[in-house]
Each structure stands twice: as structure tokens, then as C-alpha cells.
């Protein structure tokens, strides 16, 4: 085996792609800050018990595990930063009011999420803690749409779901709870034949409701159909009311209702949402409410947030990274050194061509040159 080969679904990020990713990261973090979100940096490794707390079966399967050579305990290489940020809010910050936090960092997955997906993502996201009202859900959804707009993804479809619908159905039918992961997988995959098989022995009301979920997809009017086909339980009525409110308030995206879009259901407790764009089969961003996760760290807090993979969003973004630069000669000249330093301080990219390599600079678009005119170094358009 060649020594330079990388593991499957792991890849280097080359200069042009890295530049685009980094510029997008900076733009998004600046936008998060403009909303009042504070940056946190959780560790890449944690003890596995802490890392998987409240994360469910799926997170466990996606997490790389290794043995700590100092303590002998099992460590996990994070697959999702969201639970780590919940731990920081609940256990370290210990604030009583609303807290807004954001983050950006690498995560690793044991298996790829899709056919061509990478197992090492650059996850960026934002979370609100301390407010249980729909105002927080609306703010975080608008922030996600704002982030996608900054990436040049103007035509976005926002799919809304609610974990409370399935939770209420399972609570009403103990036999449904015993189906566990199989029921969730069938719903999330819209595998109707499998769903029919799994629900065959349930009471008719719950059976029919579960079988209806994959078909309850469409614009906000599908909520009327949901009210007619699902049990008239208070928890279900509240969930549908929440979705109706958010669907009427979201701006800048086509809003759809999908009551079977349950990815991440294991730790979500309320409204869930996903963003889709044309030409991309999977969601480009996901989020939702997870009020109970903080309880595992000693303090239950209302919480909602979203995250996306910077590498994937940068790949599909039509916005090109700024690669223009000023070409300057390499000379032992104090005035030249001062001019180059001043331009760089002003935010310009200035590249000095090393002797003998004046024609090797293909990575940048040199639209200007630094030339000497009458004893002064000035920037001119490149011919």
C-alpha cells in the first residue's frame, strides 16, 4: 500500500477549496456575532460517557473510540459538536438567562452519511439556550437561512417537522415504544412496506396514525390534513400549532411540512427543521429543539440550534473565494518593504515573486502590480 493513501472518504483540502471554506467560515462567524452569539471551542476528544450523553444510538455508531493512554478510559472523537456545547452551557457557564453560543470545528464519522460524503466534516453552528418559546426557534431558523444566503444559496426550501408528534403516538401505545429504532428507521426512510409490517399489531388509531406520517408532506395546508388523520391529543395539537405558526413567520424560503423527516429524533424534543437546495439530495443544514439534553449534564435548559457542514456548503456555493492579489518584485529595497507591509496591513494580498519564479504563480489572479515610479512604489492595474 502506498504511504500517501488516505482512508476511504477522507481527503485533503487543497488551497483553492481551503480558501473558499475559510472565507465562508469567517463570514458566517461574523454574522453569528452580529446576532449576539458568543464563540466556544469544545475539545476534539472527550471521555465517551460525556460525549454520548443524550445523543442516542445513531451518535454512538458514528463516534470513533480509542483508549486514553494516561487513564485507560475510553475516549471518543467527536462526531457532533452540539452535545458538547450543551454541556458547556449547562455545566460550565451556568447562566440563568438566555445564552447564545456558536462554534466551528472538525468532526469525524465512522461511516459516511452519503455516497460521496466525507467522514471528516467541518461543522459550524449556533445554539440558543434558556428560552422555550417559539421566538427562539424562529430566530435560529432565520439565522440558518441568513447563513445560507451569505453562502450564495438564495433558493432554499425549509422542511419543518416536530418530534412531539411521534413522541405522543408512542406514549399512547406502549407496544409502539417496543419497536424502538426499527420504527424510527422506517419512518425516517419513508419505508411504507416496512412500516405496515411493524405496525400490524398496534391499536387501529395509532397504527393508522403512524402509517399516515410518511404521507403528510406538503405546504402548510397539509397541517389541516394532519389534524384530520392524527389522534386529537393535546400534545399533537400543540405540535401542529407550533408548525403552523413557524410556517407563517419564516421569510426567505419556501416552507414545507414533513412529519416523517425525523433524522436526529433521538435527542430532539420539539420543532425540527432541514434546509434543502436544488440539485443536492441531502439537507445542507439541520436543526431543532432539544430541551432535555442539558439535564444529562445536571441542568435542564430549553435549547434550539442548527449546524451545517462547511465543506459541503462551500462545495455547492456559487460564491467564489477572493483570489485577486498584487504582484510585487523581490528586491532589497526599504521603500518596497514599507509599501508591501502597508498594503498587507490594509488587507491586501501582496505576493513577492522570488527570483527565477516570476512565472510560477498560478494560484492567484494578479490584477494589479506594485511598480516603482519616480522613486515611489505605487499600485497599478496589471496589463
Curated annotation (Swiss-Prot):
InterPro entries: aa-tRNA-synth_II/BPL/LPL, HisRS-like_core, HisRS/HisZ, HisZ. It is found in: Cytoplasm. GO terms for molecular function: histidine-tRNA ligase activity. Its main location: cytoplasm. Keywords: Amino-acid biosynthesis, Cytoplasm, Histidine biosynthesis. The keyword Amino-acid biosynthesis applies. NCBIfam families: hisZ_biosyn_reg, PRK12292.1-1, PRK12421.1. Required for the first step of histidine biosynthesis. May allow the feedback regulation of ATP phosphoribosyltransferase activity by histidine. This function is generally fulfilled by the C-terminal part of HisG, which is missing in some bacteria such as this one. This is ATP phosphoribosyltransferase regulatory subunit. The gene is hisZ.
